[in-house]
């Protein structure tokens, strides 16, 4: 059985839902025993899911970037995992100052647990630990 922990980030244009699934190992919740991390980028006005990014943990090397869901093709594509690689429904790249916003939320949002670590999905510092 796994334990899910969710938190939410919002900007004027996008809504980020970060979900971590943890193995029930009796250990404290941290990234070392997380099964996967899923990030959904949602247009707040239309509630359309623009992109989905999933990381899975590799026991030997830690977190590895797996896939970016491209809603325009309903398929999974392999891309370099920088924040500029997120695309919107029109196929254009999305860059909304994610790093600055995420850092601000971390400093002010009590829903965050733990600290910052490298989250390759945005190419910036961001993992719930």
What does each model-found stretch correspond to?
Residues 1-129:
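Contiguous segments within soluble domain cores/interaction surfaces
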